[in-house]
Amino acid sequence: MGVHGLTSYVEGNRQFFTDLKLRNTHLVIDGCSLYFRLYFTTGLDQIRGGDYDAFAKVVQRFFAALSSCDVSPFVVLDGGMDETDKKFKTLQERAQSKIHEAHSLSRGFHGSVLPLLTREVFRQVLCELGVPFAQCFSEADFEIASLAHQWRCPVLTNDSDFYIFDLCGGYLPMTFFEWDNVCSKASECYIPARRFTVNRFCSHFNHMNKQLLPLFAVITGNDYTHAKTTDMFFSRVELPTVPRRRGSPSSPRIEGFLHWLSAFTNPLAALEEVLEIMGGRQKSSLRKQLTAGIQDYQLPPTSSLAQFFSNSQLQTYNVLKLPAALTSQPEWLLKRITSGSLPPLVLNVLVLRRALLIVQVENSRLPSSHEASLNIRKTIYGLLLLKNTMQCNAGRGQRGRGRGGLPEQAQSLSAPCFVEEYDRLELNLRRTTVEAQLPTHHPQLSLNTLNQVAISVRRKVLFGTLRVMEHVLQFVEPHLHLPVCVTHFWMHSSTPKPSQSLLQCVLLGLVYGELCRRKAIFGDQLHACASTATVCQNLDQLRMNSAQRRGVDLGVAHSLSQWQSCMWAGIYLNQLLCFPLPEPQSAWLFSGTLLHGLEAVLRGGHQAESLLAGAPVALQLYCTLLGAIQGFVFQNQAAQHIAPFQAAGTRGQGRRQRGTGGKRRHHRRRGGASAASDLSNRFGMLTCEDESDED
């Protein structure tokens, strides 16, 4: 939600706050506000796709600061969009605004666009640190306030609705939360902050009844109030003139309305006067609208999240709080949603059959980067919405629909199902309909029992969607399987097709991330490996300056945005399939400033292998990844007209069908699985001890 204009007014008036030394307490945190705030206020890259490794370190430092002051954090994340659609117009306007901001950033001007995988990185860091967190079914504001109300502890957020909720523990705006300035006094540490309480606020307006504040919020205008309602009231009411205080920002409408409300002893009398002023034949509907808005701020005595955090799981679900579309969903799915193991996309598709895709900084003249991951999203939608069990032979009847279509028998047993997608078209937000599709080879899957399906079957669904032959992953570490599969998918689903230098920079980025990940693990052979550290430092020096806004290569930015979209969708499909592949650490998958720097160096003539010179472990990893990708290319050419997972004996047929184009590509990209095997054998005996002997 959010009350229009209230944050700037309140934060500009120091007298509404008290200073607080935060320590030794529970703290309920608005997770979405936090990751936005941490990313945007720490100078991290927004133009080149984001620096997730640096962001993860910021998140770790934040929670380390809380821990040093004995503050116990409980993080609550937003879920899906409101099922009533009363906020959807606002969300569309924000999405349109972000399209223009992303375009502005791509041209070297100002804007704020959160990189696509930020939320996933944040969630994974919470898991790694053991920070308790939960995901709501829709907006988290009310659940956050309810939890803090029951626990009588403060809330940390950046949402002006918390100037309305009556919380005895108070509201701590992130603007004044100095987590990076921990103060030590004797044996105790504390974080300087400012606390807002409605009692103190109301005392500045003739000690007005604090129960009047919800009416104030609804009339002043929040995300759920129609603008015409606000305009109608303020065009008719006569507000008292308030003298402007020196040194404080002026907001005559807000101050005047608060003083006007302070004349009423209770909200009912004030509501009647408001309706009298607005009058007309719409009085009944206005009463209903305003009363519903006021109810949004009425907190219950207990919170369902308190039980969740006490027991690590919700034992039961209050169906009255669930959107209607979720009441019939399986319990395993609801548990994974509340635990954050499934994203808001799942909720939006189940409840509204809608997806609002996140804008990226890319070439606005080209189609959206999310077109590259369309087939992955179609499978996600199919698994969520096409729940009827299909008793049909998975390998028959694929005429007229191509590789991604449903078998004819499956089509006859299931009516078409569509999802509304909202995405960028040039500089406008466009609505399109996307048909949900069940996995071609396993159309009998049902969402109700998806978690009980054999992992081998779920893995085949994932590989089939990404068009990957499982055996070529045999030399790749399991936690890198998904990034490698996604990279293969990206290479063959993106337009324009990624260049060799782009593929190499993505793989070098994965190598860099893996080296950094292992260097941070005490006891790993790379933890104290000097040559590995040197290679990482050398690669770091190739980074683009995140503060440098101009001169971004939009072709590179667009292609890497396509990779991120494929990775984002691949992560979500893996989550929905209950992790048939290990989930990779997103913080180490992509660093935009590094990849842009690497691509420029590679395009300038440097060899990828030369950038890893002196670190055999790094070179072995790079060659293994490249060999796997080249294996995919080989298999893809061979199986262009054959279903995935078919026996290898038919490869020659497929190659003959492919013709001369396939031959040219085979000459250019030799190797395949056998090349990966040779490379693995060649470097298999090299360890960091070998490197140490040379130093």
Q: What is the predicted role of each segment?
A:
Residues 77-79, 132-143:
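Acidic carboxylate-rich catalytic motifs and surrounding loops in phosphoryl-/glycosyl-chemistry enzymes
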Residues 111-129:
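Two-metal-ion acidic nuclease core segments, chiefly of the RNase H-like superfamily
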Residues 1-68, 73-105, 121-127, 180-695:
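Charged, low-complexity intrinsically disordered segments
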Residues 28, 74-77, 134-135, 155-157, ...:
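A structural signal for short, well-ordered beta-strand segments and their strand-loop junctions
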Residues 147-174:
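Acidic, metal-binding active-site segment of PIN/NYN-like and related structure-specific nucleases
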Residues 14, 59-62, 110, 140-143, ...:
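Eukaryotic intrinsically disordered and solvent-exposed regulatory patches
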